[in-house]
Amino acid sequence: MRKKMRLLVLFICLTTKYALSSPVMTRQDLFKQAHRDVLCANLINFNDFYYSMEEPKNITGIPADMTVHWKTGKVFYTLISDEMKMSLQVLHPSGETETIKVAGLGQSTTVDNLNDIVYLATDNGIYKYKDDGSIELYTALGEDVMYITVSNDGNTMYIATWPQNRVHKITNDGQKQDTFPPIPNGHGLTIDTRNNIFFSATKTSYVLKADQSVPIKIKGLPSERMTGVFVSRSDEIFAMDENSNLYSIDAENASAKHLGNFNVSGVNTFALDSADNVLIGVKNGILKFLAYEKNPCSDYEK
């Protein structure tokens, strides 16, 4: 009997010691561990970053022509419904989406991040979108504007109009509009900080270098599968194809270098936010890949 009592006391002492030395796993701890397991199992490493995908933002339709207001973190995009109707949308940092109500048909957006101005391209001209959600007509009244981009200093705007996709140059605070012969037609206009203009024509990507009059085909990009060009906050120029292959573009040499892949198919648009996180638009969703400069799983043990 005494022996059994001694064994029971020893068992209780050992159990108490183990319990004190091993912290209790709470539900929150288990959730964090599960989240870390998923993050580290799906981590992607290229372009000097480690990328992990957040929970997708579900939408109904196909996002297009995505752009980001770096100051507020708002993501602007064109939503194409299953009935092929277009509307302009804003995805707020809170995760809520909002339809931008504008006269006529909203077709695309661009952000002048230097001056914190958001421009809306519609079938009845170009509007400015204000922080309070209100809009005002800016220029090109009566023009069916499909695409729009703004120079780095905000003084020059380029627009592509329907149905010819004719490109116009707008200056003098929206008061002067001229045709722009170097680009007879173009989709997805984008301009970098050195005023090089990127665009697509007949499913091929081109760059028109600043102060030149003849566009050059960008070498190293696949034909017919590109989703667009985006200039990051750090002035790097990127392109992505429909299979989420990311490319770095050298405007001076009109060439592209393949960087890596996000393992996503059916890409229709992409963008980068102010922290170089990558946003990818696919049918019924916007995916966000967080960018880490250091490996967040360097001390991870399965």
Residues of each region from the PLM?
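Surface loop/turn motifs at the tips and blade-to-blade linkers of beta-strand repeat domains
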Residues: 54-61, 99-104, 138-143, 178-184, ...
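Short loop/turn segments that connect beta-strands within beta-propeller blades
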Residues: 91-95, 129-134, 170-175, 209-213, ...
